[in-house]
Amino acid sequence: MGCCTSKVNADPVSTVLVIGPESAGKTTLLRCVGRRCAGADESEPVRTMPTIGQEVEYLSAPGARVMLQEIGGCLAPTWPRYYDRAAAVLFVVDAAAPETWAEALVLLEELVGAVRDKPIGVVLNKLDAAAADGAAARGLLGLEELAVDVFEGSLTGRGALVDDLRAFALAARPLSIK
């Protein structure tokens, strides 16, 4: 299978935008996907700081290269500037922080309204936290009514989610340059 890489090669690059409210776990997910793809030790905890700006992780597989581009939650007003260049979007929500769901709902509705022709994935993150309520988050965010893929994640970013996100990202096709 493919791995993460920072080498330049001839395969076209797809961009998957990774966004969501502050402290939802976007950077942890990016780093865990990167570790898994690189075959690195996943037992060490992922250390992160709030993203001011962006974080980038590259994935590759035969015939495909993907740039996972996280734009920090504090930059939500700028997210629409990135939609045209993205082949797909991942929206990360902290399922253990119900106080953030109203903001997440507004941001998700704006995203779905603006991005109609590209795959959107929603990650309900931190479901292994004591305060997590995935069913309530799904209901409030209206995920059953939206045309989105839903993924479930943990505090550590470990588990099947990493492989699911990698598959979602690698399925994104590069946009043709106009």
Q: Which ranges hold each PLM region?
A:
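TRAFAC-class small GTPase G-domain
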Residues: G2-L175
